[in-house]
Amino acid sequence: MKSITQLENKKVLVLGLAKSGEAAARLLAKLGAIVTVNDGKAFEENPSAQSLLEEGIKVVCGGHPLELLDENFELMVKNPGIRYDNPMVARALEKEIPVWTEVELAYLVSEAPIIGITGSNGKTTTTTMIADVLNHGGKSGVLSGNIGFPASEVAQSVTNQDTLVMELSSFQLMGIESFHPHIAVITNLMPTHIDYHGSFEEYVAAKWNIQNEMTSDDFIILNFNQDLAKELATQTNAQVVPFSTVEKVDGAYLENGGLYFKGELLMHADELGVPGSHNVENALATIAVAKLSGVSNQAIKETLSSFGGVKHRLQFVDTIDDVKFYNDSKSTNILATQKALSGFDNSKVILIAGGLDRGNEFDELIPDITGLKKMVILGESAPRVKRAADKTGVTYLDAKDVADATRIAFEQASAGDVVLLSPANASWDMYKNFEVRGDEFITTVERLKG
């Protein structure tokens, strides 16, 4: 971690906890800032706040009192999900207090160069592809950001031998100042999150912040299937590397079923481990990053051919209306589900659990399911899983099978949430094996997407 002094003895308000807020508060304290955390959840129901208080960090819970801002804070670090019309944020801006998100902190302390990936669709898949390709090519890509690993936490442990591969939302990119990736990727730009940003133009502007500090030594990878991307390409200091599935470009492109980079054939589209035209675009963006990073053609082909091939093991399935679906049907025991949940912010997770009743109780799972947004419970073991859920106060709903559970979970989800199938039970009460169970989840997600 870089040793920085600019935050020493500065009064900083962290607004909103969850994993990113908790990580930011700890990092700020480590950097010598005078930290106050403000979270809407009551202290008694807020293990994160309790933990921070034990570490000597001031916490104010149960609401967002505007008078808190009378304490002459010099910086606010807010949870990206909190809108800018929130009274606390609006008041901070009125008082000319800078408002950051935790990715700015991550940049300040990271010794590793950053590859930042944003866009409307395909962010998570592309981010994961890039990290996998770098690692297979011997380059050490470390996942962080909106993919479930707080950037400000991960950034503390990387070195200049690593590369931070960071998924970035428009919400996060609104709160940056000096953030400077060496390579940026914008997968595509579609009208989403207009309720948050107010207009498509403001949404695009937030995404475009990713390149604000980039120079001619840096690279931005843009989807030239879109005229908007071609227009934006004229408005950056970074070197533009385009990708396209509809035309030959000076970058990565699809031609006669082949995936090329600057005239060189790397592989064929039908060799990709994941189907769909959107995944061809994701693969082309990944190829561009990999070639700029010095990864061999063989490593690129091997990674992209096998990507997505290991199904049912915390497999990212798709995103619908900004709700991410993960298939972890292989989680047939409590430990596996504990590992799956450890990578997510519980307040955003709707967990689908239950299956074969082996007579065991689920008390071991209580710390891990505490704070979940909701659970959808099914199978023979449902009464036992519910007993554990009752001890946490988590709301749960019943489902007759995985398809029903997936539909119910999606109905309960909001933008930014995760629907996670991680049953903590074997499948044999309803399904031949965990593969069949996972396939039903995948098929249902496909039907929901239409």
Curated annotation (Swiss-Prot):
Function: Cell wall formation. Catalyzes the addition of glutamate to the nucleotide precursor UDP-N-acetylmuramoyl-L-alanine (UMA).
Coiled coil: none
Gene Ontology process terms (BP): cell division; cell wall organization; peptidoglycan biosynthetic process; regulation of cell shape
Keywords associated with the record: ATP-binding, Cell cycle, Cell division, Cell shape, Cell wall biogenesis/degradation, Cytoplasm, Ligase, Nucleotide-binding, Peptidoglycan synthesis
Protein's name in the database: UDP-N-acetylmuramoylalanine--D-glutamate ligase
Domain of life: Bacteria
Keyword Nucleotide-binding: yes
Species of origin: Streptococcus thermophilus (strain ATCC BAA-491 / LMD-9)
Catalysed reaction equations from the record: UDP-N-acetyl-alpha-D-muramoyl-L-alanine + D-glutamate + ATP = UDP-N-acetyl-alpha-D-muramoyl-L-alanyl-D-glutamate + ADP + phosphate + H(+)
A GO term, aspect molecular function: ATP binding
Stated family: Belongs to the MurCDEF family.
Binding site for ATP: 119-125
Record-linked PANTHER family: UDP-N-ACETYLMURAMOYLALANINE--D-GLUTAMATE LIGASE
Known EC number: 6.3.2.9
Pathway stated in the Swiss-Prot or TrEMBL entry: Cell wall biogenesis; peptidoglycan biosynthesis
Localisation per UniProt entry: Cytoplasm
